[in-house]
Amino acid sequence: MSIPLLYYPLSTQNQRVESFEILSNEEQSKIYTTDTLPSASEMDELIWAAYRQIFSEHQILKFTRQRFLESQLRFNQIKVREFIRGLAISDSFRKLNYDVNNNYRFVELCVQRILGRDVYNEKEKIAWSIVICNKGVIGFIDCLINSQEYLENFGDNIVPYQRRRIIFQRVNGETPFNLKTPRYGIEFRDKLVKPQFIWQGAIRRFRPQEQRPRAGDPVLFLNMVYDLNITPKFNRYPGLVNR
């Protein structure tokens, strides 16, 4: 028997406040939906927006692309909500997001990308992380996709987006999620392999470049004399020892 979703208090966020202002087109989030019967080019933009939202990439990568789901969406065999679910439960999404983060950070990423808002508090992270432990990653994604919050804001035909990122009362909007929460956490970034230089031989003498003699330096003439390797045949001054 699985544990039900634990209670967590809500916090004040822009997306919880009703909007009465009228923003310019540049400030409003563009809504990609199939309710308007999009053309072929508009469908391409909708698919690109879905990949950008779920994978947080501005380009569709070959590794993340799901051509079968794209074909089903183009021929109206599945809804946008099912397409979003297919992207979120794909192996590429799991490898790029779940395998390189802990459960708490994975919850934060999924809530931002699927529900279009930030997590309310640490208690919400704990509550959803318990769902991951009980139902697995696919069960957790299904809980978000089938939640009342998702259906009320996006329904079956709208691509999720960051809700109320800009409001009329503020000069600057909130930071986009792809900049606020990058793919890799601090724990994983510290484990990344850093490039190392492997020297084949031992370094006997090293002089920094700024300390190397330049043209006209007497040291260069002294080295030239050493390179001549002149050995005198006799010693005019027997009292002196040859070097």
Curated annotation (Swiss-Prot):
Residues 11-191 form the PBS-linker domain. GO terms for biological process: photosynthesis. It is a peripheral membrane protein. Gene3D superfamilies: Phycobilisome linker domain. PANTHER family: PHYCOBILISOME 32.1 KDA LINKER POLYPEPTIDE, PHYCOCYANIN-ASSOCIATED, ROD 2-RELATED. InterPro entries: PBS_linker_dom, PBS_linker_sf. Keywords: Antenna complex, Chloroplast, Membrane, Photosynthesis, Phycobilisome, Plastid, Thylakoid. GO terms for cellular component: chloroplast thylakoid membrane; phycobilisome. The phycobilisome is a hemidiscoidal structure that is composed of two distinct substructures: a core complex and a number of rods radiating from the core. Coiled coil: none annotated. Belongs to the phycobilisome linker protein family. The keyword Plastid applies. It is found in: Plastid, Chloroplast thylakoid membrane. Its main location: plastid. Although originally identified as Cyanidium caldarium, these sequences derive from Galdieria sulphuraria. Rod-core linker protein required for attachment of phycocyanin to allophycocyanin in cores of phycobilisomes. This is Phycobilisome rod-core linker polypeptide cpcG. The gene is cpcG.
